[in-house]
Amino acid sequence: MKLSYAITVKDEFLEIQRLLQKLLTLKQPQDEIVVLYDSKNGSIGVESYLRKMNVETTQFLWYPYEFDGHFANLKNELTKHCSGDYIFQIDADEYPHETLMDNIHEILETNDVDVILVPRVNTVEGLTQQHIEKWGWKVNEEGWVNFPDPQWRIYKNSESIRWENKVHEKLVGYDTISNLPWMEELSLYHPKDIERQEKQNEYYDTLV
């Protein structure tokens, strides 16, 4: 079985380096890494890094895409470039727990489902009680925001399965769905600081 790690990136210069280094180290030999770069809004630094890394390692594919403000369109374009039996979509500012990477093939081979929801550990440096109340968030003792925050991320590479919604996108066209256990070891990590969180919220508000 072949798995496609499918990544979207805009201006997350440090984060895309962290993610690619982890994936290149931990992925199975038959798996592929596919990166879709927002060439309309992205940074020169990210594009230069992708070009440089692609020449040096040749272990991932990357493609430019002029983002039109519609996240489902972005992810459907990303899917077109994937050749794996399953796709694991990851944003550039996220990264998977090593245990999840070590076990993902076994999980997929023993669970014949179209879509698997993945838990996510969100942390926001600088988060205050005022922010929590303003956004209606729940934060546990570990400081994780809205855990398990299930994400639509692992799905069969099938023509019938597609993304929809301009923001808060989700998958449609599947027959069966399941979720990973709500455990840190099987989660995506999503760390950010409060400044980036506020900018992201403002940006999403312009798209709704």
PLM regions and their residue ranges:
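Chalcogenol-based redox active-site neighborhoods
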Residues: 68
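Solvent-exposed polar/charged
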Residues: 25, 80-81
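N-proximal low-complexity "stem/linker" segments adjacent to membrane-targeting elements
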Residues: 1-25
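Acidic donor-binding segment of Leloir-type glycosyltransferases
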Residues: 20-64
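Catalytic-site signature of metal-activated, phosphate-bearing donor transferases
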Residues: 71-79, 86, 95-208
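Conserved acidic residues
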Residues: 3, 31, 60, 85, ...
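A short acidic, amphipathic alpha-helical/loop segment
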Residues: 18-22, 49, 77, 102-104
